[in-house]
Swiss-Prot record:
It is found in: Cytoplasm. GO terms for molecular function: 3-deoxy-8-phosphooctulonate synthase activity. It comes from Shewanella loihica (strain ATCC BAA-1088 / PV-4). The lineage of its organism: Bacteria, Pseudomonadati, Pseudomonadota, Gammaproteobacteria, Alteromonadales. One of its GO terms (cellular component) is cytoplasm. It catalyses: D-arabinose 5-phosphate + phosphoenolpyruvate + H2O = 3-deoxy-alpha-D-manno-2-octulosonate-8-phosphate + phosphate. This is 2-dehydro-3-deoxyphosphooctonate aldolase. Its main location: cytoplasm. One of its GO terms (biological process) is keto-3-deoxy-D-manno-octulosonic acid biosynthetic process. Belongs to the KdsA family. Pathway: Carbohydrate biosynthesis; 3-deoxy-D-manno-octulosonate biosynthesis; 3-deoxy-D-manno-octulosonate from D-ribulose 5-phosphate: step 2/3; Bacterial outer membrane biogenesis; lipopolysaccharide biosynthesis.
């Protein structure tokens, strides 16, 4: 098995390279907050020497309640993304939900994300593939790791091989997610870069009356476990006031903890990738 390397400017994304951070906020709440969060991430990752891609959503189309905040929408969201890109010289990742969104988003954003709940929607997959952008595929909570090959094949047949696979937990009974660490290793056997969404994996789907709950207190433990696998990247969301975040606050890392958190993750990644591989199949 050979590891595929995806190049994004000077950033190399691969399972055998130093990990890349995909981080930011869940949803764009305001221009000012997005700029504050992007600046904090940029400063911390530059200090620690971690390759970094800023993440946020312009629309959360799968909220538990019709009354929940969804975001500023695509037009306003892309303006904010462009300002972040220009101000901090950061590459960007965001998710799309409809085929018509793919091309305009790809004109601003570097990596387009396929949401877990939509990962089998062929029309969306094809529209994303045709942009030529790098694609981050969130593994659906209801799919086995080996079934990701079908989604990969769809993208390949639509002409796109620039694919990242992202683990974000699997359904375990009602209102609960668990992370199968061996499943991430199984996805790595594809050769494609695998990243770990360590904050969404903390979700308790439908765990509150009209929104998802979460286990923010365990954010460090879960991420440490994932980083021990030697992954291409870590995906996290942070907020200066998680208890009052407009989406997924119960899973968000407190922004003031970002440097301490990433210092530990980098140390684990550096250590694991310094080891020689051991083939225990023989």
């Amino acid at each position: 098995m050979s590891n595929k390397t995806i190049k994004l400017g000077s950033i190399e994304i691969a399972n055998d390279k130093p990990f890349v951070l995909f981080g930011g906020m869940n949803v764009l709440e305001s221009r000012d907050l997005a700029m504050q969060i992007a600046e904090t991430y940029a400063e911390v990752t530059q200090k620690l020497g971690i390759p970094y891609v800023f993440k946020a959503s312009f629309d959360k189309a799968n909220r538990s309640s019709v009354n929940s905040y969804r975001g500023p929408g695509m037009e306003e969201g892309l303006k904010i993304f462009q300002e972040i890109k220009d101000t901090f010289n950061l590459p960007l990742i965001t998710d799309v939900h409809e085929p018509y969104q793919c091309q305009p988003v790809a004109e601003v954003v570097d990596i387009i994300q396929l949401p877990a709940f939509l990962a089998r929607q062929t029309d969306l997959v094809v529209a994303m593939a045709k942009t030529g952008a790098i694609i981050n595929v969130k593994k659906p909570q209801f799919l086995a790791p080996h079934e990701m090959r079908h989604i990969i094949t769809k993208f390949n047949e639509a002409g796109n091989d620039e694919i990242i696979l992202c683990e974000r937990g699997s359904c375990f009974g009602y209102n609960n997610l668990v992370v199968d660490m061996l499943g991430m290793d199984e996805m790595k056997q594809s050769g494609y870069p695998v990243i770990f969404d360590a904050t969404h994996a903390l979700q308790r789907p439908g765990g509150r009356a009209d929104s998802a709950g979460g286990r923010r207190a365990q954010a460090t433990e879960l991420a440490r476990s994932g980083m021990a696998l030697g992954l291409a990247g870590l995906f996290i969301e942070a907020h200066p006031d998680p208890d009052n975040a407009k989406c997924d606050g119960p899973c968000a890392l407190p922004l003031h903890q970002l440097e301490n958190y990433l210092t530990q993750m980098k140390a684990i990644d550096d250590l694991v990738k310094s080891f020689a591989p051991i083939d225990t199949s023989k």
